[in-house]
Amino acid sequence: MALFRIYSFLAPFHILVLCQALRNYPDNEVTLLDSMSAPGDLGWEAYPSEGWEEISVMDERNIPMRTYQVCNVMEANQNNWLRTGLIQREGAQRVYVEIKFTLRDCNSLPGVPGTCKETFNVYYHESNNAVAAPLRHIRESQYIKIDTIAADESFTQTDVGDRVMKLNTEVRDISGLSKRGLYLAFQDLGACIALVSVRVFYKRCPLAVLNLARFPDTVTGGDSALVEVRGTCVEDAEELEGPRMFCSADGGWLVPIGRCVCRPGFEEVDGHCQPCRSGFYKASAMDAYCVKCPPHSYSHQDKASECVCERGFYRAESDPRSMACTRPPSAPGNPISMVNETAVTLEWSPPRDSGGRGDVSYSVHCRKCSGETGASERCVPCGSGAHFNPRQFGLTHPRVLVTELQPHTNYTFSVEALNGVSDLSPSPRQLVSVNVTTSQTVSVILKERKGTDSVTLAWQGPEPVDGTVVEYEVTYYEKNQQDQNYTVLKTKSNSMTVDGLKPGTTYIFRVRARTDGGYGNYKGEIELETSHEDMLAVGDPNQQTILAISVAGGAVLLVLLVACFIVSGRRCGYIKAKQDPEEEKMQFQHGRVKLPETRTYIHPHTYEDPNQAVRDFAKEIEVSNIRIERVIGAGEFGEVCSGRLRLPSKREIQVAIKSLKAGYSEHQRRDFLSEASIMGQFDHPNIIRLEGVVTRCKPVMIVTEYMENGSLDTFLKKHDGQFTVIQLLGMLRGIAAGMQYLSEMNYVHRDLAARNILVNRNLVCKVSDFGLSRVLEDDPEAAYTTRGGKIPIRWTAPEAITYRKFTSASDVWSYGIVMWEVISYGERPYWEMSNQDVIKAVDEGYRLPAPMDCPVVLHQLMLDCWEKNRSDRPKFGQIVNTLDRLIRNPSSLKQLANSAVWEDPVTPEAAVNTVEDWLDLIKMGQYKEHFSSAGYVTLDSVLYVSSSELDKMGVELAGHQKKILSSIQCLQAHHGTQVQV
């Protein structure tokens, strides 16, 4: 018993050290029995009475704890039992038994015979009864053995002296439970042991919220199988896919499947659904978060699933709830009518306000009016007689052709712009109207006289006339030869003498008038036969008179010339030197003076047979003379290759070859070859040269001279900063000379840009790209479509954008942009501004600033090219003269535009005293309220404005920012301050 007392004394010391840690259990463990937490005696039953003994000890908080000890090691045949009360299993099919104990090393007990043991047994018994049979009647067969427990560490007398206790922990599981509860029994066969703690628990998967689904506490299964658990959505959430998870045997959640989502009007926040606050909405459960109401809509209450449109704004039925509310467009602008007899072409510009939508369409309404003035004028719908091409309603482009109108009739056409919400607005539609009067044809042609090689015609103009007659067009051809060749002549007179005809040949003549409203129709035909040559002597007395006068006049002129040379050769030489060189080329032929010939561009569309235009202006090349070497690019119609051309009796040259891709239509073939028929009319060192075409075999080819350095924009970017100003001027001079030649031939390029200028090895620049189709759909610089393709907004003059009015003056505007591209080494005009912002900025007076290191005189020439009034822009001939003068006088290029601010202290900014005056000076007055609201009310405060602050103020256009910041630099120079902007 002495040993027992020693043990009972030492065991509490060990408990005090560890008890606090023993009471913290994981969340997934549910305790059914914990001996350390019992408030009083455990009341377990022991048998025999001298076996297991309940001992009460104090933990570090002076809370009593109950333990059981036994140490009957001196006597053999020990069989001491200890049994717990009924432990309710609470539905668990598997429970765990955790035993914490200390055990004395038998070898450390002096004088103990071989009866000492170092193990004990643990049993359990299932029962539905809370009262068990007395332990003295226990039969071991009634209990199921869990295990024999041995200590991993046992303590000795030395450990007792050193106050070192060794605590063992063993955990065993019991599965397959089915009854109400179970009893645990501990069997001692002669060990010295203390049960410090006995805990019975089961494992569960604790309550969890995952993917907005709540999964309840779930008891693990009776074996290692997973238990499938179905979750329920949290409040204000709904199932997207049935949420499920699996509870594992060790009490952990595995394999989440499915999820819940917050209902419309709610968003997920920290695992629950929170209502959208005012001003926000969530339209669909599939959306993750509440978002701010789209422009022109609002939500005044929480939980909004959609936002309501502001007054005057609407949302179409097909519009998503995330789309901004929109409104009907404003009226179209700038209507233009072009009358061609009984047909009218109507064009207009898109509405200034599209209503915020991209589905703008147009409808055209036609009324036929009586022509009376004032209130007595009566108009009625045109009815089905007028034909609209492509259609009358639902037009997607701002253009329509109206045909089959009645001649000499007043019409009113009203154009309205519509979009997807026009039908939702109660406001009346906004229209723009234009009045036109259909014109009448030229009256019948009259023959005045005819000769062997000429015919004189006369006619009367249209009456009444729609506008002023600009000119008349006379077309004639040999009878039965119309399909092969015909000639077009123009005159401002009501009569014309047609020369160069074949004697004794029958011709067909037709005449039509062109007024401000366009061309009229041809009025009838007149068939005339020229006289035979042998009829002149005895025939027309007029011819004899003309011949006699011609002979006499020639004789007199000859006498005068001889006298001039004899009397004063020097004086006549002086007179000749002052004479127009063109006058020397005059010749007398058949009694008439033949005037010098002026070349004029002939549009391929004037040919009824486009193939004839190709034959007239382009040389056919045998394909055997061409050798293709490599592909250098791809064009609109097919590949572009480099190769060699070898013509008979000529040296081999390098050429560029455009080929027409397979599967082309006849229309594509005509468009492809039309470029050749245009290029073939030009002969200038700064215009790309046509070598010829291949049309008699496939693929069809256009062969041009080869330009080694490719397009000018790419070439400049590749060689940024590597040329002198004089070299750049030489390039610009070549481009201007080529454009002067084109303008003198009455050819308008329409797409002059650095990308359409080619550069050869000698840095000679040549104008290219003369295609008729102007299909630029893949060009990122293009904007809205016209009859000739898309317009490259950044290079195009304002009148050409607004009214489709392309002239040599609009080419001059484009040339100014090319100048800017060249000096900036291929920088993109207007930088990253959108096309619409460019149109708006230019219309408000903004012009591109001088590129870096740009001479002042060059930037001024650019500004001259960008005059809003096209008549104020220089002609190409003037531009060439200006560039020649600058090249001859390099000193004029020294002053740089971007350094002029610092060199000249007297700037326009020096004369202003207020922010408002300053903004008006630089034509940025629309931003007065922006500056005032931001607190910039004095010029001193403006000195420190940066680009980021301009963004905050709402000055978003990049061009406007550059203009304001540039002027701020002038202000800083005047005030002696320099701030990084």
UniProtKB/Swiss-Prot annotation:
A motif (PDZ-binding) lies at residues 979-981. Heterotetramer upon binding of the ligand. The heterotetramer is composed of an ephrin dimer and a receptor dimer. Oligomerization is probably required to induce biological responses. It holds the Pfam family EphA2_TM. Widely expressed in the developing zebrafish nervous system. It is found in: Cell membrane. The keyword Nucleus does not apply. It catalyses: L-tyrosyl-[protein] + ATP = O-phospho-L-tyrosyl-[protein] + ADP + H(+). One of its GO terms (biological process) is regulation of actin cytoskeleton organization. Keywords: ATP-binding, Cell membrane, Glycoprotein, Kinase, Membrane, Nucleotide-binding, Phosphoprotein, Receptor, Repeat, Signal, Transferase, Transmembrane, Transmembrane helix, Tyrosine-protein kinase. Autophosphorylates upon activation by efna5. This is Ephrin type-A receptor 3. Its EC number is 2.7.10.1.
